[in-house]
Amino acid sequence: MQNLNNHYKPDNMSDRIALSFTKFLRFVADIFFKKKYGHRAVVLETIAAVPGMVAGMLIHLKSLRKMEDDKGWIKILLEEAENERMHLMTFIQVAKPTPIERFIIISAQFIFIIMYAIIYLFSQRTAHRIVGYFEEEAVFSYTEYLDELETGRIKDQPAPKIAIDYWNLPLHSTLKD
């Protein structure tokens, strides 16, 4: 596996809060999902789709309230939320969560939406740093997943049709692709 120890070092209290929050969520995911990388990806993408939507909505409301242009941020943030949603739709096809797992995922998303919105309202810097640390954790998790696929500990499988269509992949692409 590649060296994944490089990450943004916390500079201040806001960064330390963001890193601690991210590490706590990673700890919870590790307890629940261990080596079930498909399920971990579903939760990761469920959570990853939230920040762009929340930030886009709050900037939209601020733009309306102040009657000022958003300088294109709403569109960028909502496009990011949509991209993360497509990752989620892909991994739902891979992991095939049970109804109970879906309920847990929806509950986690609901709680995270509220928590992230509160954090964003109090400190946009902390909220954006959380997203940065989430991306670091995503790289770590997906690198582990890819390592499991490449070593054969997890069987590779055909890429879901939704992924092939969304990312214009060749017809016979696999999960590794």
Question: What are the residue ranges of the model-derived segments?
Answer:
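Non-heme di-metal
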Residues: 1-177
